[in-house]
Amino acid sequence: MATASPRSDTSNNHSGRLQLQVTVSSAKLKRKKNWFGTAIYTEVVVDGEITKTAKSSSSSNPKWDEQLTVNVTPQTTLEFQVWSHRTLKADALLGKATIDLKQALLIHNRKLERVKEQLKLSLENKNGIAQTGELTVVLDGLVIEQENITNCSSSPTIEIQENGDALHENGEPSARTTARLAVEGTNGIDNHVPTSTLVQNSCCSYVVNGDNTPSSPSQVAARPKNTPAPKPLASEPADDTVNGESSSFAPTDNASVTGTPVVSEENALSPNCTSTTVEDPPVQEILTSSENNECIPSTSAELESEARSILEPDTSNSRSSSAFEAAKSRQPDGCMDPVRQQSGNANTETLPSGWEQRKDPHGRTYYVDHNTRTTTWERPQPLPPGWERRVDDRRRVYYVDHNTRTTTWQRPTMESVRNFEQWQSQRNQLQGAMQQFNQRYLYSASMLAAENDPYGPLPPGWEKRVDSTDRVYFVNHNTKTTQWEDPRTQGLQNEEPLPEGWEIRYTREGVRYFVDHNTRTTTFKDPRNGKSSVTKGGPQIAYERGFRWKLAHFRYLCQSNALPSHVKINVSRQTLFEDSFQQIMALKPYDLRRRLYVIFRGEEGLDYGGLAREWFFLLSHEVLNPMYCLFEYAGKNNYCLQINPASTINPDHLSYFCFIGRFIAMALFHGKFIDTGFSLPFYKRMLSKKLTIKDLESIDTEFYNSLIWIRDNNIEECGLEMYFSVDMEILGKVTSHDLKLGGSNILVTEENKDEYIGLMTEWRFSRGVQEQTKAFLDGFNEVVPLQWLQYFDEKELEVMLCGMQEVDLADWQRNTVYRHYTRNSKQIIWFWQFVKETDNEVRMRLLQFVTGTCRLPLGGFAELMGSNGPQKFCIEKVGKDTWLPRSHTCFNRLDLPPYKSYEQLKEKLLFAIEETEGFGQE
């Protein structure tokens, strides 16, 4: 339970806040029932900080019973907002209510312990403010001392000054407050002098982000004489300055010394002085005597008379100036304390964000860094230009120098940066002189190679390196990957991939040669066309690279760039789409390369690969569902998918396409299959291949036939008046698009109809889906670089992503193993009889029940993947004949009980396949 005191410890929370336990219990909402279901959650807003509860599935009577911990002050106002979460739209506000902690503390005798509040929810609409329901919350764990509210026992006055204006919360100031003499400047600046009078039970004066300008001389209190001095960091100090602004709760113990202090002329007359106030020490401490500069203190009577003449209530500029001249005439020249003036100038500088100035019991000034929870005697300076403060994943503060692209743990200052620059300049000059002396007549081989590089500079973010065996490789800092292929030549249309086992290297002079790792030989001749890098000509060399080699090369890239550990994905089957979207988009793209550990809520299954396969299969079926308007079928007779131009109706459609791109890349990276594939033109666009008119035939036969007719016939004889412009209708809105600049005024003729056909083909593939395609490819490229797919064509990419759909029964039987059964067991014979009699759909359902997916890899059942690599289909004898069959998707194993008849086996298998959903543990 948090207890507040006037000098509460602020080591954990630098702003003096206290912890309050807020339990959001339930709500009763006046709204229509939503047949599609919705999720209700509550936001608690405390001084701009938002804390959310979990989502409740009830739409009218949601219950949470969730405890939230918030940091508050006695003046905090708690705001509760009840929201309705929507999947494809922005969340809707259902109502809001507020609690004033100050009133609640006064009502409940400064104690909030298990206080139950029934809040009326309201919402502003076009007809006014309407009541939308009730919210039940419980406040607990906050006890405030009386001094923290009234701040004094005998005088309830609390003075809060903000921007120079005095605000009195509890009425006019009491007559028992200490009389204070002040000289006001032109801008209402407080240049006060504490008197020797000491008044007990006086109220504190708070200065908030402004100049301390009391409306009358009797509004500032002195600190009690016997109050113990605070310690640094253990309790609140006497004088606090946050970001250069003073918050003086009371003077130090020196206030009881007899005598009238001398006021600094700079503080009294400077019109641009900040709100920082420093208590003036007594005259006996200010006036000193030395050999070079002797200052003789005046008598007490003279000082008092001067103080009366100076500190009259009518403090105009002229009178205050003449008064100070009179005070200075009493002293020799130069008697003003230089230390005092210097400290005044230092305090006018603004502290960096998160820093606070305090004083210890000995009056020494120190500084608190609330960002790192450390203290220092040196005054912090603002960061030099080009520097930035950051926090790493372990909450450690470090500093980034964008000028040199370096980082450091130590906070930089202008002096340290200046010293480092001088040292670095001298070091560079010395190294340059030494290098110029040592290599006077030598040329840099790397510089010569870079100048002679026929491909020019590398793309942005790429770097060329050499390993220990002098093999050149390339680093992509954008995706944190490495590869052997040169990115400048990778994916060129006019250059085909190398044969298996071959590699391109460059000499020191930049001449390209080829390495055959099969025979461990090198040659200047290109094995693809026989042309030499040195001499032109030579015979053509035919070669063929199979799909298996490409797939093995892709798997090698994935394994070499995989990260250790695993990433958990906790989803519910009822909200699979939204849960997966929130978690995948919250992770860093490179974290998605870690091994996946999927958890279905409410199910106790352990993921050794089987749950991940089912998650990919189920989620792909969900996200590619045309019902969400993100994708549509490519044609009437083609059930492959393509991006829906009407997907812009969803305001967050680009975020969803980026998520789908990440998800598809994860499926390729982890070797999992999805349920439904895309159209072949979409795969070609992923591979950056040019789309032709022939690709239109598979997605829009009518459009394709129209363009073919235009190509094969004379359109001028037919009298067709066509222009380089086309209309498109999306959701009933018709828009016109020019195929080229000014196309609506350019007539299509026999001479330019080929250009028209090409532009129409390009427009048909990209109409209304440019932004969606870019978002999809950006999300895909964040996980799997598109360069890794350069060797594949669109059909091979489809097989990699969707697998094989046809089931070869002979291959299935040939690659099945048995445990406690034999090939001639009657249950095994009945099982294969059941598989032969069913259609392909039931076989797919059976395959999904056992392996987690209904798709097969390219190699068929021989390449089924288990938890630790390839694992064949297995049938094991388990249980009694009254049991249902069970499956272990991580190991591709079917537990088949010893049934006594074929009819019993068929009935149990069909029931398990069609009715079972979920995982458990044995």
From Swiss-Prot:
It comes from the Eukaryota. CDD domains: C2_E3_ubiquitin_ligase, HECTc, WW. Activated by NDFIP1- and NDFIP2-binding. Keywords: Cell junction, Cell membrane, Cytoplasm, Host-virus interaction, Membrane, Nucleus, Repeat, Transferase, Ubl conjugation, Ubl conjugation pathway. Residues 588-922 form the HECT domain. Pathway: Protein modification; protein ubiquitination. One of its GO terms (biological process) is protein ubiquitination. It is an enzyme of class 2 (transferase). Changing D675A: Reduces ubiquitin transfer. It is found in: Cytoplasm; Cell membrane; Nucleus; Cell junction. The active site is at C890 (glycyl thioester intermediate). One of its GO terms (molecular function) is ubiquitin protein ligase activity. Changing H621A: Strongly reduces ubiquitin transfer. Residues 349-382, 381-414, 456-489, 496-529 form the WW domain. InterPro entries: C2_dom, C2_domain_sf, E3_ub_ligase_SMURF1, E3_ubiq-protein_ligase, HECT_dom, Hect_E3_ubiquitin_ligase, WW_dom, WW_dom_sf. The keyword Ubl conjugation applies. It is a peripheral membrane protein. Residues 1-116 form the C2 domain. It catalyses: S-ubiquitinyl-[E2 ubiquitin-conjugating enzyme]-L-cysteine + [acceptor protein]-L-lysine = [E2 ubiquitin-conjugating enzyme]-L-cysteine + N(6)-ubiquitinyl-[acceptor protein]-L-lysine. Changing E806P: Strongly reduces ubiquitin transfer. Residues 210-388 are annotated as: Disordered. Pfam families: C2, HECT, WW. Detected in heart, placenta, pancreas, kidney, liver, skeletal muscle, bone marrow, fetal brain, and at much lower levels in adult brain and lung. Isoform 1 and isoform 5 predominate in all tissues tested, except in testis and bone marrow, where isoform 5 is expressed at much higher levels than isoform 1. This is NEDD4-like E3 ubiquitin-protein ligase WWP1. The gene is WWP1.
